[in-house]
Amino acid sequence: MARGGDTGCTGPSETSASGAAAIALPGLEGPATDAQCQTLPLTVLKSRSPSPRSLPPALSCPPPQPAMLEHLSSLPTQMDYKGQKLAEQMFQGIILFSAIVGFIYGYVAEQFGWTVYIVMAGFAFSCLLTLPPWPIYRRHPLKWLPVQESSTDDKKPGERKIKRHAKNN
């Protein structure tokens, strides 16, 4: 029986986390299926007079998962250490370059606004280049050590050496 954090529709025999019983609608027996979740709001709206209120939480169904989010979750998100260093250097270099160019152009044109626009464009460009995990940042993957069996079970407690640290006076 689903409780509180369930993502599906609640059927007539289910209760919420607070213990309140769900509303039983005619024609629904057992837990609601996906097809019932799609037609349930229409049934409820037809049975009541129209009102600006939305459906109670017990009768609402979860929104379908968009296909784009499923595609985005399959993209790799890791970045190796050398890639992180490269991304940081590129970010700082682009920001510094755009700040210098923006300052010079703004000084020559006597328009501080152009300095701000050029620095903002440099920031946006550096974010575009460094925030997504592009393949250039994943060229040096980490080599993990193989899992080793722990050998501490074989030693007896008396065989271990006790390390003593020198006292600092």
Curated annotation (Swiss-Prot):
Residue stretches spanning the membrane: 94-114, 116-136
Region span, (Microbial infection) Interaction with JEV NS2B: 91-169
Record flagged with keyword Endoplasmic reticulum: yes
Membrane topology: Multi-pass membrane protein
Positions on the Cytoplasmic side per record topology: 1-93, 137-169
Free-text description of this protein's post-translational modifications in UniProt: May be phosphorylated.
One Gene Ontology term, aspect cellular component: endoplasmic reticulum membrane
Region ((Microbial infection) Interaction with HCV NS2 and HCV E2) location: 110-169
Family, as annotated: Belongs to the SPCS1 family.
Protein name: Signal peptidase complex subunit 1
Organism: Homo sapiens (Human)
Protein's gene: SPCS1
